Regions:
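Accessory beta-strand-rich segments of carbohydrate-active enzymes
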Residues: 3, 22, 26, 30, ...
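Hydrophobic alpha-helical membrane-insertion signals
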Residues: 3-23
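Beta-propeller folds
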Residues: 7, 17, 61, 65, ...
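Short, low-complexity, polar/charged sequence segments that are solvent-exposed and flexible
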Residues: 10-12, 33-36, 92, 135-139, ...
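Intrinsically disordered, low-complexity regulatory regions of eukaryotic regulatory proteins
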Residues: 10-16, 27, 33, 154
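N-terminal glycine-rich cofactor-binding segment
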Residues: 36-45
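Alpha-helix boundary/capping detector
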Residues: 40-41, 142, 170
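Surface beta-strand/loop "capping" patches
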Residues: 151-176
Length: 176
C-alpha cells in the first residue's frame, strides 16, 4: 500500500493479500471510524494528495475453449475507487463502493497467461457521497469473478408495467 498514487508503479517486493479482504484488517492502514466528520479536509470534489493506494495483480490462464465466449470481469465490492488493466491495457474505472462493477474484457484477453492489475484508491470524489456513520475499510472487500458467457447474451432485461384507470387491465413492455 502506498500513500501516493505515483509511488505505486514498481512491483518488486510486494506482499500478498487475500481477496476479498480490507487493508486495515491486514495491517496496511489505520482503522478509521467517522460519524459526522469527514476523515479528511472537506473540499469537494478534491481528495487529499496523500491518498492510500493499493495495487493487486493476478495472472490467470485461459484456454482456447474459453476464448470462444465473451469474458467479463466482475467486482462485487471495491472501496473506494479503482482502475483495472488487463495485459497492460486500461479496461475501466469504478467508484461505486457498495455495488458490483463489471468490465467486458473480451477484446483484451488471449489464450494462455493474462495479467490483471487493479489499483484501488482509498478516497475518491464519491467518498463525499458515501460518508456516514461507518468504519472506513478499503480494498477489494467482496468476491471477484471472471465470467465466461455466451456471445450476445442478454445481460439486462427491463420490464415496465402500467395499469388502466380501472386498475383491472395492465400493459407490459419489455426491452433489453
Amino acid at each position: 500500500m502506498y500513500k501516493r498514487q505515483e509511488q505505486s508503479r514498481a512491483c518488486e517486493g510486494w506482499d500478498k493479500i487475500d481477496v476479498p479482504s480490507v487493508w486495515q484488517l491486514r495491517g496496511y492502514d489505520k482503522m478509521h471510524y467517522t460519524d459526522v466528520l469527514y476523515p479528511f479536509p472537506v473540499n469537494p470534489p478534491y481528495v487529499p494528495d496523500e491518498n492510500p493506494t493499493g495495487i493487486y495483480k493476478k495472472t490467470v490462464v485461459l484456454d482456447e475453449q474459453w476464448m470462444e465466449k465473451d469474458t467479463v470481469l466482475k467486482f462485487h465490492g471495491v472501496d473506494s475507487a479503482f482502475d483495472v488493466w488487463v495485459n497492460g491495457n486500461h479496461v475501466g474505472f469504478g467508484k461505486v463502493s457498495r455495488l458490483p462493477s463489471e468490465f467486458d474484457i473480451t477484446g483484451f484477453v488471449k489464450t494462455g497467461e493474462n495479467d490483471i492489475t487493479v489499483r484501488v484508491y482509498k478516497w475518491s470524489d464519491g467518498t463525499y457521497l458515501e460518508d456516514q456513520d461507518m468504519w472506513w475499510l478499503s480494498g477489494i472487500y467482496r468476491d471477484v469473478e471472471l465470467i465466461n458467457e455466451e456471445k450476445n447474451a442478454v445481460l439486462d432485461l427491463r420490464v415496465n408495467g402500467t395499469l388502466d384507470d380501472s386498475y383491472k387491465n395492465g400493459l407490459f413492455t419489455a426491452g433489453i
